[in-house]
């Protein structure tokens, strides 16, 4: 399984959520609403979830092993950092 596309929308809020992503797997399956979170130990991805009646959150879709989770997280965070650098370059170009 390969992550064949990552779409990312950065969010400018005061909270810990920094972006929302959608990924395409093997050009065949899309997962929306994956969140990029600024945690205590750095950035990580949180899979789409829904609140249960008792107030807990339950993942709607998630990888079943750590290797797959690593692939997904690596692809999303690479795109997050790429967009961050692009935004910096655009700001610098506009300032000069």
From Swiss-Prot:
Record flagged with keyword Cell cycle: yes
One of the GO BP terms on file: division septum assembly
Alphabetized UniProt keyword annotations: Cell cycle, Cell division, Septation
SUPFAM superfamilies named in the record: SpoVG-like
Pfam families noted in UniProt: SpoVG
Signal peptide: none
Function: Could be involved in septation.
Annotated family: Belongs to the SpoVG family.
Family matches, as PANTHER family: SEPTATION PROTEIN SPOVG-RELATED
Protein name as it appears in the record: Putative septation protein SpoVG
